Amino acid sequence: MDPRLSRAYGALGGLALGDALGMPTQALSPAQIRSMYGHITGLVDADESQPYAPGMRAGSVTDDTEQALLIASLLVRGRGSSSGHAHLDASEFAHTLLAWEDSMIQRGSLDLLGPSTKAALERVRAGEDPLQVGGKGTTNGAAMRVTPIGIAVSTANPDIFAEAVWSSCQVTHATRQGFQSAALVAAAVSMGIDAA
């Protein structure tokens, strides 16, 4: 197997595994985690009192992995852009997130969007321009889902890299904190893929 492809699989697999390991502990303090689970050493079911994923089965992934896979899918579809570089259309991403949220609600999931993403997408749903709604996003949403950007776009061309990261942040996390955190995660992934 091509080493870059193997590392890409590893990056996505690592994202999903880390997400599944952390799923039962979302939004819990260290004391709450110890009280509910003791010392976690593997995949466990979420407790019924878990605020975001009550009763979720061990090994289940959250919106972190699901949103990353949405970005990966959009990047694959955008590969034929005129620039020849991986491309993520921010407006299309906003509408894809809305459709994903609707499907999660229909399936009865409580593990939906974080506060910054939710607030921005409510404005999109109300008819606002998707490229103008992310100015208050200071949570971790952009960083948690950016792994596919790091896989698809090398840091070798910083301008193209920054543009790709920005396109994944703009709709929900168009802030310095949102962009910088996503850029750091994507850069670490990109350098790992490039074996830098």
Predicted regions and their residues:
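Structured, active/binding-site neighborhoods that engage oxygen-rich ligands
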Residues: 1-196
